[in-house]
Regions:
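Extracytoplasmic
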Residues: 2-7, 63-67, 121-123, 176
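Short N-terminal edge-element motif at the start of the domain
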Residues: 1-2, 11, 24-29
Length: 186
């Protein structure tokens, strides 16, 4: 009786949980090979294409930025809603519009999905630089390139909100590629 192996491999981006490479195939048929040998041969036959998809995905991240998502919430005790007007540089606009513009000014791309509401804002498909420059706290005048992630990006937005309006906010992570900014205090 001939034996063969069907298999499926799916590689996921740890930041977005999106599939970046899939390989489904059947291995060669054999009367005498062990299951381990059949599996090894089946995977080896498809590995070059699978790894090429990984490399293309990584090149895309380097060129276009790493994808993250943000979630904005407001504490119930916070006196403002995200669709309330605020003044910024002599202009009145909804707080959510200002957030959208600020994200666009610091993201690698300005093409992201923005879904505002009065109590929450969901932002997805934001592209950020893979690395950012950060001051070395132990060596004066020295800066290092460090990995960037959703929390560091959200921290920057949180500091902007506090500096411009005095609104406190709390940043929490939801995995590597997603962060929540809760505005106001309890």
């Amino acid at each position: 009786m001939q034996k063969y192996v069907d298999y499926g491999i799916d590689a996921l981006d740890a930041y977005t949980n999106k599939s970046i490479g899939v390989s489904n195939a059947s291995g060669p048929k054999s009367m005498s090979a062990s299951v381990g040998d059949l599996l090894r041969q089946a995977v080896t036959d498809q590995m070059d294409g699978f790894l090429a998809r990984h490399q293309d995905y990584f090149k895309g991240i380097v060129e276009n930025g790493r994808e993250i998502s943000l979630e904005f919430k407001r504490f119930d005790g916070f006196e403002y809603y995200f669709n309330d007007d605020v003044e910024f540089k002599g202009r009145e606009m909804e707080f959510s519009s200002l957030i959208r513009r600020y994200i666009g000014s610091i993201a690698k791309n300005k093409n992201f999905s923005f879904n505002p509401g009065e109590n929450n804002i969901d932002v997805s498909q934001i592209k950020i630089e893979m690395e950012i420059e950060e001051e070395d706290l132990f060596e004066e005048g020295k800066f290092d390139m460090v990995p960037n992630d959703a929390k560091k990006f959200a921290d920057k937005i949180s500091r902007f909100i506090k500096k411009q309006f005095g609104y406190p906010s709390k940043v929490s992570t939801i995995g590597l590629g997603k962060a929540r900014i809760t505005v106001g205090s309890k």
